[in-house]
């Protein structure tokens, strides 16, 4: 009964947060505010190749999302600008997002140490390394940072370590009104039941999940059912990553049944942001983002 109450609380919190973050303006090409149960955001990772090779400037991300794709909410990726992310840079990111009327949703944080490492000193350092990103998220107006619950050892050993690491980071983030959310991102974290156990172990309203449609590869030889995994993680979700790859002639993703996935998302009572995260190799980054957006709008408009 306690678990059900907690899930109900998280669902209600997600709805309240989504309601507060609704924007007063719409893109001419987007139907989401009026006709869909969720909001569309753009994950910076969808353009990671262009940011990495210098074709695009991370400072222009908000402008690109709004003007190129008609999307008014963005999800940052720390590794694409971590080498220059001092206070002045973060302030400039915020200014540019504000100038273009774009909401900063979250920061996906990588390469700051493993929060699930069984080495206590390394885990403590990893927690501390994430502090600056909590502060950056607060400055940008994000509601969360996305972290990884990685570590070496048995499933139980890493679970216990992740509960400790996430718990300590969440206590810090709570003081800044920031959520700490974990993505299924390989290893044990791609096992839905394992990550649920971690969430229950942390048992903090600011610690949740970021279900990703595609990241359910546990190892080179083991995968977890993506639909089962998303369903298991949704009760704790404070965000959703709509991972897309390649598309058929009808505009559907070949690898992921978006209609089925979004029904799972809706059935969980989620009404927040669904982030476009394109990783295909048949379309370019721009075309892949547009295709994913069209698919989300097509599926979403039929469900609302």
Cite the ranges covered by each PLM segment.
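N-terminal pre-domain/capping segments
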Residues: 2-139, 157-160, 174, 192-193, ...
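Acidic/histidine-rich catalytic cores of soluble enzymes
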Residues: 73-74, 163, 167-263
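A short helix->loop->beta-strand "cap" motif at the edges of active sites that frequently abuts
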Residues: 102, 178, 268-272
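Short glycine/serine/threonine-enriched helix-capping/active-site loop
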Residues: 107, 145-147, 276
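Active-site groove signature of glycoside hydrolases
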Residues: 137-156, 176, 181-185
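Active-site cleft segment of glycoside hydrolase catalytic domains centered on the general acid/base Glu
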Residues: 152-166
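Conserved active-site loop/cleft motifs that coordinate metal ions or position small ligands
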Residues: 242, 272-279
